Amino acid sequence: LDRRDWRVNANANQDYSLGGLILNTSGKVVANYWLDEVFHPDAGRAHREGDLHIHDLDMLSGYCAGWSLRQLLAEGFGGVPGTISSTPPRHLSSACGQIVNFLGTLQNEWAGAQAFSSFDTYLAPFVRLDSLTYEQVEQTLQEFVFNLNVPSRWGTQTPFTNLTFDWVCPADLRDQYPFIGGEPVDFTYGDLQEEMDLINRAFIAVIGAGDADGRPFTFPIPTYNITADFDWDSPN
């Protein structure tokens, strides 16, 4: 409570709160289980004596995970016992909402980052189908980023999220037809470079602006695929 233990400040994503107190307290029980029952006694002793440090002992779970955004958008978010289920999204706003719900839910089962790849490629069809303007895309992505930065995971933490952007449609997807709302559309992912550009430009604008106080967003952490056909001269 008086924050004298160094471990209170070990996680920059966790603030002083009731949720943080609960996580820190229960985490010590879990950490002792790891050291006594899972790791070799020599490893447990080495950690306790400061010879080495084993990270994230507070969580009896895997570390990081990557998921299929294409599968989520094709099937909708569901299958989690005791929670609501969604049909496949038909619009950019509902797609972003399901991504937030998915990442927030799965984050509670993992210690580290949750990631989606090809974010711009897989969301571009929604921009095309609804003929969205740049302003509409930017507004939707602003809501998306703000929602991802709500402290909704255990310990009053923000979900640790990572998104990979292709910038240019990958060769293995260029001739494939998206399924939106469970139905195929009459264009391929390779036809959507203009829509991908809108998404990338809007996302960078939102991340660059920060929140209402100008504070930078912690998440999602963006990763860009730098391939041989990367457009270095893009206006974005």
Regions found by a protein language model. Name each.
Residues 1-236:
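Conserved catalytic cores of very large enzyme subunits
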